[in-house]
C-alpha cells in the first residue's frame, strides 16, 4: 500500500514538473499564407434569409388585454384582424397594436431540409412561434431565444402561428436552413464529423490552447474556433497541431485572394527573366511583363507587392507580441513552421506555371531567412482539383512543382525532413480552386487537418 502511494505521488510530481516545463516554453507560432482558399471560403451554415414569398396568407389578430400564458388564443375571439399585405422583407405591413397580437398563416419552403425560424427583431423577438404545431421559437422578455429545428418538405404548406408577448410586434423574421450540403454545421451536427467543434448544446466551441490571429484578410484575434460565416484550413490545422503540441500555439494567417506567386507574392531577390519574347518582372519591378526591347511602363503594383504586404503585417504582429497577446506576456515565441496553400492564379499564365517550382523553392528559403527561422518546417498543399494524371499542362506544372519540394522526393536535399507536400486531390469534395471548392467545408477542414498532420510529422522527425 505504501509503495503504491509513493508511486502515485511520484507520478503526480512528474506530471506537475512536465506541465510547468511546458508552461515555460515559448509559444509555437505557425504562419499560414496563400491566396483565396487559404483566406477561406468553407460555408459554416446556410445563413439566415429574410422572410418573403415562403410565407403565405399572413393575418394578424388582436386580442384584448396583455399576454396571458394560460390563455388559448385559438379559442378566443379577436377584437380585430388585419390581412398583412407585406410580410417579411425590410418593410412589412405595420401591425395595428391595441392588445395581444397573434399572426397566423402558412409556410411553404421550396427545398426539403431541416430549418430554424428566427421571428422578430429586437423587442419583437419576444414571442412564441409554432410551425406545423411544433414550437420552434420562444423568447421571454429578458431571456434568451430557445429554438428547435424542424424538418420540412419542399412545396408543402404548413400552418404557422406567432404569439407576441409584448406590444413590440411586426412581420420581420428570418429562416435558416441547417442542413445545407457541405456546410460545417451540417457536417458536424448531422454528419457526425469533427465532433470537437461543437458542444452537446449545439454551440461552437473554442480551444484554449490555440490562438488565431488573422491579418490582411480573414482578420481576427481570438481563441481558435468557429466564428463568422466562412472557414479556411486554419481551423483543421489549428486542431491538428494543438492536439499534438504541449505548448500553446499561435496560428498567424496572412493571406489574400486572387494572387500569384509569379507576380504578387514574388519573393525578394527574384530576378527578371525572358519567356516567349517577353521580359517578366523581377522583385519590385513593374509591370508584370513587357515586350523584349521595349521600355517597361510601371503600373500601381509591382512584383512582390503582396509578399511585402502580407509578411510585413505578420512582422508587425510578432514585433509587438506582448501587446498583441497579453495572456502570453513575457513568454516569447518560436516560429515552428510555415504553411502555404496557393497556385490557382499561376495556372493561368504559362510563364508563371513554368517558373512555379523555382519561385516556390525561393519562397521557402526566403521566408525562413526573413523571419530568422532557419529550422522552421514548411508544408505546401496542392490544388484540390489537380490529379497526378491530369492532362492540363499548366495545372500539372503547378502540381509537379509542389510535389518536387517535398523532402521525400529527394530533388532538393536541403528540404529533407523539413519540407512536406500534402496532395489534396483525394481530400477535395468537388469543385476547383477557382470556385473555392463550391464552399464545401469538408474540403477546407480535411486539407487543414492534413497540413497540420504533415507539419507534426516534420516536427517529430518522422
Where are these regions (language model features)?
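Conserved Rossmann-like nucleotide-binding pocket used by diverse enzymes
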Residues: 7, 18, 379
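Bacterial N-terminal signal peptides that target proteins for export
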Residues: 1-11
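Hydrophobic h-region of N-terminal signal peptides that target proteins for export
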Residues: 12-22
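Acidic/polar, compositionally biased interaction segments
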Residues: 54-182
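A composition/secondary-structure signal for short, hydrophobic, low-basic-content segments
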Residues: 4, 17-19, 31
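Cell-envelope and extracellular/periplasmic
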Residues: 23-72, 177-462
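A periodicity- and composition-biased signal for non-globular, repetitive helical segments
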Residues: 8, 14-15, 41
Amino acid at each position: 500500500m505504501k509503495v503504491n502511494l509513493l508511486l502515485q505521488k511520484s507520478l503526480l510530481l512528474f506530471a506537475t514538473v512536465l506541465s510547468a516545463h511546458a508552461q515555460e516554453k515559448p509559444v509555437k507560432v505557425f504562419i499560414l499564407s496563400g491566396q483565396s482558399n487559404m483566406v477561406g471560403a468553407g460555408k459554416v451554415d446556410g445563413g439566415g434569409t429574410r422572410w418573403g414569398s415562403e410565407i403565405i396568407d399572413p393575418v394578424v389578430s388582436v386580442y384584448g388585454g396583455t399576454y396571458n400564458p394560460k390563455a388559448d388564443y385559438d379559442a378566443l375571439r379577436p377584437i380585430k384582424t388585419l390581412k398583412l399585405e407585406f410580410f417579411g422583407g425590410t418593410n412589412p405591413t405595420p401591425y395595428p397594436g391595441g392588445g395581444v397580437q397573434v399572426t397566423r398563416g402558412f409556410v411553404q419552403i421550396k427545398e426539403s431540409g431541416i430549418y430554424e425560424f428566427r421571428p422578430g427583431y429586437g423587442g419583437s423577438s419576444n414571442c412564441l412561434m409554432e410551425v406545423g404545431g411544433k414550437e420552434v421559437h420562444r423568447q421571454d422578455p429578458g431571456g434568451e431565444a430557445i429554438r428547435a429545428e424542424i424538418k420540412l418538405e419542399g412545396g408543402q404548406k404548413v400552418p404557422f402561428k406567432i404569439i407576441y408577448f409584448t406590444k413590440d410586434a411586426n412581420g420581420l423574421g428570418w429562416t435558416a436552413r441547417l442542413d445545407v450540403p457541405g456546410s460545417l454545421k451540417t457536417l458536424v451536427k448531422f454528419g457526425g464529423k469533427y465532433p470537437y467543434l461543437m458542444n452537446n448544446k449545439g454551440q461552437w466551441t473554442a480551444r484554449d490552447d490555440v490562438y488565431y490571429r488573422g491579418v490582411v484578410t480573414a482578420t481576427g484575434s481570438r481563441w481558435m474556433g468557429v466564428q463568422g460565416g466562412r472557414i479556411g484550413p486554419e481551423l483543421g490545422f489549428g486542431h491538428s497541431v494543438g492536439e499534438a503540441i504541449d505548448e500553446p500555439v499561435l496560428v498567424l494567417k496572412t493571406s489574400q485572394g486572387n494572387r500569384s506567386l509569379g507576380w504578387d507574392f514574388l519573393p525578394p531577390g527574384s530576378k527578371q527573366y525572358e519567356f516567349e519574347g517577353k521580359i517578366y518582372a523581377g522583385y519590385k519591378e513593374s509591370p508584370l511583363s513587357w515586350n523584349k526591347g521595349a521600355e517597361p511602363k510601371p503600373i500601381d503594383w509591382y512584383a512582390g507587392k503582396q509578399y511585402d504586404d502580407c509578411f510585413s503585417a505578420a512582422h508587425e504582429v510578432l514585433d509587438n507580441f506582448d501587446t498583441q497577446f497579453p495572456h502570453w506576456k513575457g513568454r516569447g515565441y518560436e516560429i515552428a513552421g510555415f504553411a502555404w496553400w496557393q497556385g490557382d492564379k499561376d495556372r493561368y499564365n504559362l510563364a508563371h506555371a513554368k517558373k512555379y517550382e523555382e519561385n516556390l523553392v525561393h519562397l521557402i528559403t526566403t521566408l525562413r531567412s526573413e523571419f530568422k527561422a532557419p529550422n522552421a518546417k514548411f508544408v505546401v498543399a496542392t490544388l484540390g482539383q489537380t490529379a497526378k494524371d491530369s492532362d492540363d499542362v499548366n495545372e500539372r506544372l503547378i502540381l509537379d512543382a509542389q510535389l518536387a519540394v517535398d523532402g521525400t522526393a529527394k530533388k532538393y536535399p536541403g528540404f529533407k525532413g523539413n519540407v512536406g507536400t500534402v496532395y489534396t486531390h483525394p481530400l477535395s469534395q468537388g469543385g476547383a480552386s477557382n470556385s473555392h471548392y463550391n464552399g464545401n467545408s469538408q474540403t477546407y477542414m480535411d486539407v487543414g487537418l492534413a497540413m497540420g498532420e504533415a507539419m507534426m510529422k516534420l516536427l517529430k522527425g518522422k
